[in-house]
Amino acid sequence: MFRRRPPLPPFPPGAALVGGAVRDWLRGVRSADYDWAHPDPAAGARALAALVGGAAFPLDEERGYWRVTAGEVQHDFVPLPPNLEDDLRRRDFTVNAIALREGRRLVDPLGGQQDLKRRVLRMVSEDNLRADPLRAWRAARFVTTLSFTLEPQTEQAVRQVAADLKAGRLPFPAWERVRDELHALLRSPDAARGILTLEALGLLDLTLPELREGQGLTQGGFHHLDVFEHGVEALHQLLTRRPDADLLLRWATLLHDVGKPRTFARDPDTGRRSFHGHDRVGAELTTQILTRLKLPGADVKRAAALVKAHMVQLPADDAQARRFVHRRRELLPDLLSLMLADREAARGPSSSELGRFAYMLAMERVLAALEEQPAAPPPLLSGKEVMALLGLTPGPRVGEVLRALAEARALGEVGTPQEARAFVQRWAEETPGS
């Protein structure tokens, strides 16, 4: 069922390999993170570092936590518990409650190997699940990333954890921890299925309630799905075409229409639905969501910018394509990937093969313009030169002139300092200052 088992790192004497690395090894997957339990973590870490040519250093000397780094591989050491089997019984799921001793001797008190073979995710106990409610999100993540089935009693227990979290009967995990589980899920090729799993388990309402607002909100026209389903399908379409898409693009694609429920209106005469300004409101909501999840400010800003720009009109000719690239260069090519995923996730009555073909042609114009000029050309005139030429003092007008000149250069309308000076003088005459 699984691939051939990869080679293991050398075992420091007395160590036990525990956790996900054992699970992955049994599945035939090479791990980049190894968790070790050792009677003397410092000695074990130093011994392994010498064997693999890595560096050993303490993470928390008082508690006996050590780490070894060797290239892209990381090894963490903790003290070996007095009773290894008892320690395994305190873990989250049976497939993670397996240890490996020297000589490839497995310690599996809960039948984790059998669950691995059956591709079933089973909790060790409901008490363990409730002891750390984050394990509910871990269940959704493992079901998604391992393509496992959630055992029925475990599914029921996860649903109960979600209900108790919502009712305040259990403490909510730190948002940073929730974010890390979401990111592990979103990195999966099956991320769209993972979002649906979160919804089925009652966890999406706790995590992304704004996204759920689109459930049942039909759109008509180009769309065959409701707003929520369309966002999930757009994520699926993105990963079909760009399996290497980074997390920010995945977030932006999932959330690109999150503003629609709050901008929904219906014409009383025609019954036609509209969502005017949903791109702007969606960008604001994206900022709120990703800030809540503690993403870095620069990442939040970029994801929100992608959401805000996803409705921009594609160019009708080559000149417009060059202008498109100049004005949105920092978002490319990700913006095009988002827009294409959006279009491919819409197969309503107004959608047609001819329309999709025309859309692709417009995208190809933009890609050609981006390939022709992958980076913005250096400025032909400085701000000081513009001020001297037009008799200006420092202020917004100088920025307006420089932006107009930069666009003219990107469009190929000017190419030399002499042409730039003539353009600036002409532009200033034709464009009165505010």
Curated annotation (Swiss-Prot):
Catalysed reactions, as listed in the record: a tRNA with a 3' CC end + ATP = a tRNA with a 3' CCA end + diphosphate
Annotated ATP binding sites: 20-23, 91-92, 96, 132-141, 177
GO molecular function (one): metal ion binding
Domain spans labelled HD: 227-339
Cytoplasm as UniProt keyword: no
Residues binding Mg(2+), per UniProt: 33, 35
EC number: 2.7.7.-
Cofactor: Mg(2+)
PROSITE patterns xref list: HD (PS51831)
Enzyme kind, highest EC tier: transferase
Record bears the keyword tRNA processing: yes
Pfam families found in the cross-reference section: HD, PolyA_pol, PolyA_pol_RNAbd
Gene Ontology BP annotations: tRNA 3'-terminal CCA addition; tRNA surveillance
Similarity comment text for this entry: Belongs to the tRNA nucleotidyltransferase/poly(A) polymerase family.
Protein known as: A-adding tRNA nucleotidyltransferase
Organism listed in the record: Deinococcus radiodurans (strain ATCC 13939 / DSM 20539 / JCM 16871 / CCUG 27074 / LMG 4051 / NBRC 15346 / NCIMB 9279 / VKM B-1422 / R1)
